[in-house]
């Protein structure tokens, strides 16, 4: 007789308790078909998390297959903990982005902190040492106190974990819109470096080999976290605080160092982080990839308190844990290592040749499931989409008050400086950060070499909402340009797809079209997708977030020498590269003046992005450019002001654009600051002005002449978010 009191198989079926765990009637019937019998309580729990949207991608898998995943530099693509890309000299960069949206909505500090911890372990499980962290965040409008609380909690959680574990946070983006009220987006990215011959895989093979658990003792925190992440947020979500995990960065640091030492042991067969769905996903996925069976003895699992049932053990998402498979007879070598690092560890099972996933507790069987169907036969749903109707009318931008519009855009929290927030992150730990958070992609030196890794994380929402296909292309191209702007060669990307409920036709169509656009851009820009994550059901009280694909992209700088002189000075000339058109659909200007973002915009020319990018990268590496900035949200005037304020330099420029075009967000444009005495010889390059010692932002077109003190601009730009957070409390 079981020592744990749980519903019987019959009760589960008759009362449809499986629905509370996330399985539909059809999915339950499929489980019965696979097992040839009714599942017990633990088995239902296991199937429910493995077949959740978060783990199985059952609504998005068809779209993910269209992404290019191979390329000249790709060593390992999707399917493992993170992607691996060659950077020469037998070295590789390892990277991935993950979402922690739902947990952060309920417990912002812990939700964000554990998101950072989880993505770090993904990188470490491949065998790489993390070199930097990035994040992409979305919140509702900052005039709402709840959004202020979420922002403060998330930023504190990111800084608290990253700073303690000793990994710099070097880049990110934060945007604000009412569509994220109650449903913030917290996407965390980690980048690491590894030698080719040290790359690990999450596989369980070799009959008789042992399974070792290491890390924090298992508790009841995070149970059904994967299922929670696959649901819409409702008023009842607050009651699911137990589904939010609790992080411990100090144990995380020990686990990271112990893992990086363990991968040097030849006797290590496979390793995987216990992330979403905890012990269930890590163990069953390792068995599936190894074509093996597993027998886990759950009475051997280290637990935080007595009485934790097999169901709770398998579904717990206690943080800071890894699962290893090691050669039989070498267990003590690994246990001694973990003991040295003051970590709990235990041998909890072995690899079998049965192709079954068997769980016992005190020799009583609590689950007996065929491995492959559990891991690989989750249902895939292809639904019906519905095209959105676009507003083809034209807004009137002929009577813009340039100065008033400029100040309002500069102070909008989405555009305003995030300096106050980023200063809570340790940006320099490890002493390899070359370019810190600010205007550009981050650059981190590869220790012991002249190489560096440039990384950026960029999301797009309004444009994807307006025209999903074009918006999908746009978000990939934006990341590409940000790497070009520091002289890096873009190599590959990771993505996080944040959308509402795919069961709503319009949102499903957004997913179809935007991923098609992203795929097209990846192919033309030669940036294959090597890892990623999908987060659906981002809705609060029936209102969906904007469709928000986020792209993390890495690039290689073979020799960082040119970066010593990559800083603008007075006397340097300013060039605008690219044509400025009347592109206002989806722009900050449209939102500011009309409160909506429902107008079409010009398509993006990907071939032009490639040719232009090569020329600008060459100008940077040849020492011609002292700074390059992509023209982004808010348009040309705002971009120029940010450069002036960031570097405390005056600027004088004459712009051949209309008043409205000062704020146009035409894609594919760069501001290139050229060193005094040099010339930028590039098609579409127009010299528009120069930098000055005089602290004056002096910009004009044929209609308006603007003169502002740089210090005033800087105060408005840097003080906007601080003012929101202090005056609204």
Swiss-Prot record:
Main subcellular location: cytoplasm
Chain residues that bind Mg(2+) 2: 122, 273
CC annotations in GO: cytoplasm
Active-site residues from the entry: 54, 100
SUPFAM superfamilies: PurM C-terminal domain-like, PurM N-terminal domain-like
This enzyme's EC code(s): 6.3.5.3
Short name of one Pfam family: AIRS_C
Principal EC category: ligase
Domain of life the protein comes from: Bacteria
InterPro entries: PRibForGlyAmidine_synth_PurL, PurL_linker, PurM-like_C_dom, PurM-like_C_sf, PurM-like_N, PurM-like_N_sf
Binding site for substrate: 99-102, 121, 245, 317-319, 535
Coiled-coil segments on the chain, per record: none
Oligomer status and interactors: Monomer. Part of the FGAM synthase complex composed of 1 PurL, 1 PurQ and 2 PurS subunits.
Family named by the database record: Belongs to the FGAMS family.
Function noted in UniProt: Part of the phosphoribosylformylglycinamidine synthase complex involved in the purines biosynthetic pathway. Catalyzes the ATP-dependent conversion of formylglycinamide ribonucleotide (FGAR) and glutamine to yield formylglycinamidine ribonucleotide (FGAM) and glutamate. The FGAM synthase complex is composed of three subunits. PurQ produces an ammonia molecule by converting glutamine to glutamate. PurL transfers the ammonia molecule to FGAR to form FGAM in an ATP-dependent manner.
Name the record gives this protein: Phosphoribosylformylglycinamidine synthase subunit PurL
Organism for this UniProt entry: Staphylococcus epidermidis (strain ATCC 35984 / DSM 28319 / BCRC 17069 / CCUG 31568 / BM 3577 / RP62A)
Gene that specifies this protein: purL
């Amino acid at each position: 007789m079981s020592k744990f009191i749980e519903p019987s198989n019959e009760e589960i079926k008759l009362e449809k308790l499986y629905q509370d765990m996330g399985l539909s009637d059809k999915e339950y019937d499929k489980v019965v078909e696979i097992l040839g019998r009714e599942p017990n309580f633990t088995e239902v729990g296991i199937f429910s998390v493995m077949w959740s949207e978060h783990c199985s991608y059952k609504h998005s898998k068809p779209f993910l297959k269209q992404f290019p995943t191979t390329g000249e530099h790709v060593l390992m693509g999707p399917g493992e903990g993170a992607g691996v890309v060659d950077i020469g000299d037998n070295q590789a960069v390892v990277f991935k982005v993950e979402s922690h949206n739902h947990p952060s909505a309920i417990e912002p500090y812990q939700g964000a902190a554990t998101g950072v911890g989880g993505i770090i372990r993904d990188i470490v499980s491949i065998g790489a040492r993390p070199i930097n962290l990035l994040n992409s965040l979305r919140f509702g409008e900052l005039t709402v106190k709840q959004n202020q609380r979420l922002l403060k909690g998330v930023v504190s959680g990111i800084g608290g974990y990253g700073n303690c574990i000793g990994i710099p946070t070097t880049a990110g983006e934060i945007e604000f819109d009412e569509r994220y009220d109650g449903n913030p987006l917290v996407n965390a990215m980690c980048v690491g470096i590894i030698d080719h011959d040290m790359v690990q895989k999450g596989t369980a093979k070799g009959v008789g080999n042992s399974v070792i658990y290491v890390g924090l003792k298992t508790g009841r925190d995070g149970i059904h976290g994967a299922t929670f992440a696959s649901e819409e947020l409702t008023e009842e979500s607050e009651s699911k605080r137990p589904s939010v995990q609790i992080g411990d960065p100090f144990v995380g640091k020990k686990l990271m160092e112990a893992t990086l030492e363990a991968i040097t042991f030849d006797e290590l067969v496979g390793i995987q982080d216990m992330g979403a769905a905890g012990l269930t996903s890590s163990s069953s996925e390792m068995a599936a990839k190894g074509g093996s069976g597993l027998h886990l003895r759950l009475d051997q699992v280290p637990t935080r308190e007595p009485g934790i049932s097999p169901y709770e053990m398998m579904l717990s998402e206690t943080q800071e844990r890894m699962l290893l498979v090691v050669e039989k007879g070498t267990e003590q070598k690994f246990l001694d290592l973990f003991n040295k690092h003051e970590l709990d560890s235990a041998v909890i099972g072995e690899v079998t040749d049965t192709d079954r996933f068997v769980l016992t507790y005190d020799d009583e069987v609590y689950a007996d499931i065929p491995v492959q169907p559990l891991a690989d036969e989750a249902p895939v749903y292809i639904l019906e989409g519905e095209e959105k109707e676009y507003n083809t009318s034209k807004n009137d931008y002929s009577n813009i008050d340039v100065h008033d519009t400029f100040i309002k855009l500069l102070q909008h929290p989405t555009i305003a400086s995030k300096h106050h927030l980023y200063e809570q992150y340790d940006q320099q730990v490890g002493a390899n950060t070359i370019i810190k958070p600010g205007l550009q992609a981050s650059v981190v030196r590869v220790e012991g070499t002249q190489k560096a890794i440039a990384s950026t994380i960029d999301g797009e929402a309004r444009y994807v909402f307006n025209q999903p296909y074009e918006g999908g292309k746009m978000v990939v191209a934006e990341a590409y340009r940000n790497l070009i702007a520091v002289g890096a060669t873009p190599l590959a990307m990771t993505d996080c797809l944040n959308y509402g409920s795919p069961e709503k036709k319009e949102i499903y169509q957004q997913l179809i079209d935007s991923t098609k656009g992203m795929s097209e851009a990846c192919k033309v820009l030669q940036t294959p997708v090597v890892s990623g994550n999908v987060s659906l059901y981002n809705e609060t009280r029936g209102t969906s977030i904007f469709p928000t694909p986020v792209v993390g992209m890495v690039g290689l700088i073979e020799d960082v020498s040119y970066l010593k002189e990559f800083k603008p000075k007075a006397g340097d000339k300013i060039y605008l590269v690219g044509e400025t058109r009347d592109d206002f659909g989806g722009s900050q200007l449209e939102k500011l003046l009309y409160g909506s973002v429902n107008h079409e915009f010009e398509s993006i020319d990907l071939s032009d992005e490639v040719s232009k990018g090569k020329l600008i990268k060459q100008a940077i590496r040849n020492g011609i450019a002292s700074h390059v900035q992509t023209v982004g949200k808010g348009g040309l005037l705002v971009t120029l002001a940010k450069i002036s304020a960031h570097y405390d330099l005056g600027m004088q420029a004459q712009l051949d654009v209309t008043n409205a075009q000062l704020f146009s967000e035409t894609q594919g444009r760069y501001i290139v600051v050229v060193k005094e005495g040099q010339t930028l010889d590039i098609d579409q390059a127009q010299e528009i002005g120069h930098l000055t010692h005089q602290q004056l932002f002096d910009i004009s077109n044929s209609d308006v002449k603007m003169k502002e003190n740089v210090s005033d601009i800087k105060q408005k730009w840097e003080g906007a978010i601080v003012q929101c957070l202090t005056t609204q409390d």
